[in-house]
């Protein structure tokens, strides 16, 4: 899959040597023809082989940037900023040479039974003018880097059960 994506991108004059190659004019041209083309970039990031040295370096950088940005989000107090903050996180990581992709999707949160809190859903919708149910960053070695889930609008004590930073390797 990875080599097929590399061939396709190169055939269309899209260089793949930098984490933000989706900003290349030829990539943008393809995305204008096919709005789902950005998914190919995410697949490229997911399928790309990474060295152990890269993974070790990336893990440290991702953790440090997520920690700083999470604190900024908490200090700001803005709720429901998942799309914006995930975009900012991915851009900072790209500037630091980290391969990543912003993921927009849905999210279900089940709370411990003792909490007496009901399951919370952030659903994506295929109809209407909605950006996303929720957004996070995929940045190998992490499948999920989410610094905004706790900063959504919740009722009751739900926030008490959600970590400020979620970093999952195998999702």
Predicted regions and their residues:
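A structural boundary/capping signal
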Residues: 1-171
